[in-house]
């Protein structure tokens, strides 16, 4: 399915000399928007072709997993919010609504086999982004409500049976990774809680953000100097940590910390944390200051998932700089270098665009350029998010409360309220349990067919 006619068209264009690197002047808003448009149109063209063949809104084809589709639509939501170009809004809205699942929490039954907590939260974060930029309201419910549903289902899964807490990577026992408590799932729940606190002013979200962050430091997923490690096995009571580091995890923790810094009016605790994360991000910068995926980029061994991580990272770093000016200068230097490198390693011709993974000369030659349709959706998404991240300083978080929401509340106990003040022993937990049971039955039935 990835071998498309568009690839052949682009190959012909390249051979005849009409393709060129994407033109980008990082000091020109018009140039940034124009470059972003080229990349967004390449992603949407691939999506449209997929939709015409498969007729399932919200999905990209194999080998892309469900979570990356959520990432793609989050990037397109941002594209609308940052450029004010609404051309793709109807597609975005249809995709998000189609992937909600029966209970409006981004748990579609047909994704049960690949549905982890981090996968679900990618879509929840996209829905919250839709709320922030005021994407036209869905047919029923609201983008904010859908994001809250994700939060409520995930906090009901907070597991104190091992490691004194934490969120497992996988939701269902039959999926590989069920006993792994990882930075991706816990970091994205931390970020979701911090963003909901920012958007609603509800202190329960801030309490949960504190609780999650404190737990990650206690088990060693986040080190004392703010390095973020991949995960730990709860069958060993989280006594051994996998120390591999990824850009996306680091940046999402950075964004969450920046939001807590904002909510606490620059408290010393969150000042130290957010500046620590930015200092530790030097792990991921190459020659010239551009972002690199240090664990796999230089040796050319990034897999299909890992090749999309840098886009997540530049997005979160850009948002962190917006709400925590204390770290803005350092982050903007990295974003500028990354955007330049991304534009340089993408070429466009006609309706086609190809991108490679590398933005830094220190890792050049470790990946090939290709279109989204020919296997490089992650690379094109990375470039889009790197370039449009330059626009974050020009916009405000729409609907943000910007107020203090008690982010330093104690977490020695367990915040028990949901976003609406109800106890988790009530409807929130019951609904989440129903989700899990229904989807497990659906998956078991599917296996028996």
Protein language model annotation of sequence segments:
Residues 93-194:
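Extended ligand-binding groove/face enriched in aromatic
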Residues 84-87, 134-144, 200-204:
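Short coil/turn connectors between adjacent alpha-helices in alpha-solenoid helical repeat scaffolds
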Residues 22-75, 79-118, 122, 130, ...:
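CBM-like carbohydrate-recognition segments
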Residues 186-200, 204-261, 274, 278-281:
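Active-site cradle of extracellular carbohydrate-active enzymes
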Residues 3-21, 437-443:
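Cleavable N-terminal signal peptides of Sec/SRP-targeted secreted and luminal proteins
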Residues 80, 131-135, 197-201, 261-266, ...:
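Short coil/turn linking the two alpha-helices of tandem helical-hairpin repeats
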């Amino acid at each position: 399915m990835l071998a498309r006619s568009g690839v052949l068209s682009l190959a012909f264009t390249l051979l005849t000399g009409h393709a060129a690197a994407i033109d980008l002047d990082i000091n020109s808003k018009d140039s940034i928007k124009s470059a972003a448009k080229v990349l967004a149109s390449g992603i949407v063209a691939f999506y449209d072709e997929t939709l015409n063949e498969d007729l399932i809104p919200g999905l990209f084809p194999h080998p892309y997993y469900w979570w990356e589709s959520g990432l793609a639509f989050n990037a397109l939501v941002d594209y609308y919010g940052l450029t004010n170009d609404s051309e793709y809004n109807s597609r975005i809205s249809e995709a998000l609504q189609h992937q909600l699942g029966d209970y409006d929490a981004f748990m579609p039954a047909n994704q049960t086999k690949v549905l982890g907590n981090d996968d679900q939260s990618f879509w929840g974060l996209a829905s919250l982004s839709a709320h922030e930029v005021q994407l036209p309201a869905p047919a029923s419910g609201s983008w904010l409500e859908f994001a809250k549903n994700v939060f409520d289902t995930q906090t009901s899964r907070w597991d104190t049976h091992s490691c004194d807490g934490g969120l497992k990577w996988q939701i269902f026992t039959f999926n590989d990774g069920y006993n792994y408590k990882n930075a991706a799932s816990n970091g994205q729940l931390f970020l979701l809680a911090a963003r909901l606190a920012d958007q609603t002013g509800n202190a329960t979200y801030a309490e949960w953000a504190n609780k999650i962050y404190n737990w990650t430091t206690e088990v060693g997923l986040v080190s004392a100097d703010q390095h973020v490690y991949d995960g730990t096995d709860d069958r060993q009571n989280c006594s051994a940590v996998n120390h591999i580091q990824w850009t996306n995890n680091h940046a999402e923790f950075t964004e969450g910390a920046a939001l807590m810094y904002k909510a606490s009016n620059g408290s010393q605790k969150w000042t130290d944390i957010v500046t620590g994360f930015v200092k530790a991000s030097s792990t991921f910068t190459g020659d010239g200051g551009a972002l690199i995926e240090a664990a796999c980029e230089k040796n050319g061994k990034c897999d299909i998932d890992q090749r999309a991580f840098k886009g997540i990272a530049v997005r979160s770093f850009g948002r962190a700089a917006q709400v925590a000016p204390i770290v803005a200068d350092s982050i903007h230097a990295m974003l500028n270098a990354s955007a330049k490198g991304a534009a340089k390693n993408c070429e466009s011709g006609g309706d086609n665009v190809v991108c490679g993974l590398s933005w830094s000369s220190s890792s050049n030659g470790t990946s090939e350029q290709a279109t989204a349709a020919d296997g490089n959706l992650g690379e094109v998404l990375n470039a889009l998010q790197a370039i449009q991240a330059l626009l974050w300083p020009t916009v405000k978080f729409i609907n943000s409360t910007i107020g203090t929401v008690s982010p330093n509340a104690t977490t020695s106990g367990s915040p028990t309220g949901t976003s609406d003040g109800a106890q988790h022993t009530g409807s929130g937990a019951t609904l989440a349990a129903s989700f899990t049971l229904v989807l497990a039955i659906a998956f078991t039935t599917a296996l028996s067919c």
